[in-house]
């Protein structure tokens, strides 16, 4: 198995979680599916219209002869039908065909709005030029010898760009998400992987993150990682790889707390440090 960031990041919670996710892959969530649609619309606009379609309300009629207003879930000959018995023609399927992705109408509208915002954002448009999107890279980690792989959102000859869709509406909130979600580790993983794979020079520019908000007015911000942030990401990656090697060698994948823990409540808790108990307690 070639190690990727989507797997390695689980070690930041516990080795047990990583092992569990390898053995029990998560089904795709609706937010993840929406994120993939946004990525396609922004990074592969020529493929988007032919790949992503939306569901509609059921095109059948009720017994009363009125249009069915249920959301369509079965597809036949360009039309959507609901799951009510008799509404979908024989031969209707859950998917329109191979290579076609389905999202609801609101999601498709949101996807297009996000893509338009990124295109209209001058710094982001400039970054997403002169390179190639959705690049698969493979490399052997120089320090550990582990075979690795990754899928880079956008790769230019001189720099790597990562795209994120977010509900955050301020720079401060998004920066907090970068730390909490380990995005700095992810971008460091891709950058150093691209360098080791010969896709970036050793003196490549620090990578960028383009963040597009999925909340109105679909604002866009482009960030370049500072050197300190990139180095923090690299340290995180090295720590996780070292832990992965240890667990693999031992065949032991412990949870968050394999040993007995002492529980100590914080100082602000009622009763701590002689504090009086509030009426609510």
Regions found by a protein language model. Give the residues of each.
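Short connector loops/turns at beta-strand edges and beta->alpha or beta->beta junctions
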Residues: 68, 165-169, 212-216
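Secondary-structure boundary elements
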Residues: 124-127, 156-162, 195-205
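Metal-dependent nuclease catalytic cores that hydrolyze phosphodiester bonds in DNA/RNA
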Residues: 1-69, 77-149, 257-262
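Short amphipathic alpha-helical face segments that pack within enzyme cores
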Residues: 33, 37, 185-193
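Metal-dependent nuclease catalytic regions and adjoining charged, substrate-binding loops involved
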Residues: 189-281
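Conserved catalytic cores of phosphodiester-cleaving nucleases, focusing on short active-site segments
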Residues: 150-176, 190
């Amino acid at each position: 198995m070639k190690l990727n960031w989507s797997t390695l990041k689980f070690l930041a919670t516990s080795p047990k979680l990583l092992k569990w996710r390898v053995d029990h892959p998560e089904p795709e969530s609706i937010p993840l599916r929406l994120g993939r649609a946004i990525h396609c619309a922004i990074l592969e606009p020529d493929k988007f219209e032919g790949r992503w379609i939306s569901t509609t309300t059921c095109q059948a009629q009720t017994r009363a002869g009125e249009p069915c207003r249920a959301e369509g879930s079965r597809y036949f000959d360009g039309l959507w039908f609901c799951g009510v018995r008799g509404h979908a023609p024989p031969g209707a399927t859950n998917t329109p065909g191979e290579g076609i992705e389905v999202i609801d109408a609101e999601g498709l509208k949101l996807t297009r709005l996000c893509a338009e915002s990124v295109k209209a954002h001058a710094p982001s448009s400039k970054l997403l030029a002169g390179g190639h999107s959705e690049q698969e890279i493979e490399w052997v980690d120089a320090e550990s010898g582990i075979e690795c792989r990754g899928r880079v959102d956008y790769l230019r000859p001189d720099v790597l760009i990562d795209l994120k869709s977010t509900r955050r509406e301020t720079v401060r909130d998004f920066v907090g998400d970068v730390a909490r979600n380990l995005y700095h580790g992810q971008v460091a993983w891709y950058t150093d992987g691209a360098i080791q794979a010969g896709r970036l020079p050793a003196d490549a520019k620090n990578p960028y993150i383009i963040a597009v908000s999925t909340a109105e007015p679909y604002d866009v911000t482009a960030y370049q990682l500072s050197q300190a942030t990139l180095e923090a990401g690299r340290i995180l990656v090295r720590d996780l790889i070292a832990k992965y090697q240890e667990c693999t060698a031992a065949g032991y994948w412990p949870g968050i707390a394999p040993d007995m823990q002492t529980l100590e409540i914080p100082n602000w808790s009622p009763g701590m440090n002689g504090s009086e108990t509030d009426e609510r307690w």
